[in-house]
């Protein structure tokens, strides 16, 4: 009897989440905005941070150093937006700093759990640029490496796009 009650509650909870939560999950909640200079990441088990060594922008140690791209920040942003638009279940939910700071939400395939991806594009000089990137799960304590895999895949795609296109 208890099994069926727990199962019914779980099914009802998932159904309510799918029915009511879709639009709400595509917005940033209070406290989810990121300032790379003032990061507060209580848990790193469900997040992956990539930051440049120069210019130093992140106030916490990154999981990986950001690459330098052979394009200016505006072109890097344009290529990023092109790459992100081709990704499944990704929504641009915010922009700041003259569109140099972008926030996306990508939903998992089956349960549609939201992950928040924040990126900021930075000049390094001589027509080159880099970025600060944080991918994190909205829910849960661990992510089974999903955020690190996303960052790796997206950076590989971005490198291919920037090396193919370059500056005009």
Predicted region positions:
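Ser/Thr-rich, low-complexity intrinsically disordered terminal regions
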Residues: 2-3, 14-168
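Hydrophobic alpha-helical transmembrane segments
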Residues: 9-11
């Amino acid at each position: 009897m208890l099994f069926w009650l727990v199962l019914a509650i779980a099914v009802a909870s998932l159904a309510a989440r799918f029915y009511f939560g879709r639009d709400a999950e595509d917005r940033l909640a209070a406290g989810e905005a990121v300032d790379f200079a003032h990061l507060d990441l209580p848990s790193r088990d469900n997040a992956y941070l990539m930051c440049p060594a120069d210019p130093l922008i992140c106030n916490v140690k990154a999981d990986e150093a950001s690459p330098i791209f052979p394009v200016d920040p505006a072109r890097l942003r344009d290529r990023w937006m092109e790459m992100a638009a081709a990704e499944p279940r990704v929504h641009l939910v915010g922009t700041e700093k003259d569109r140099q700071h972008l926030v996306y939400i990508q939903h998992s395939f089956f349960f549609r759990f939201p992950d928040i991806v924040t990126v900021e594009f930075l000049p390094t000089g001589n027509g080159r640029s880099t970025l600060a990137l944080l991918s994190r799960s909205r829910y849960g304590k661990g992510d089974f490496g999903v955020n690190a895999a996303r960052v790796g895949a997206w950076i590989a795609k971005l490198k291919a796009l920037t090396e193919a296109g370059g500056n005009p």
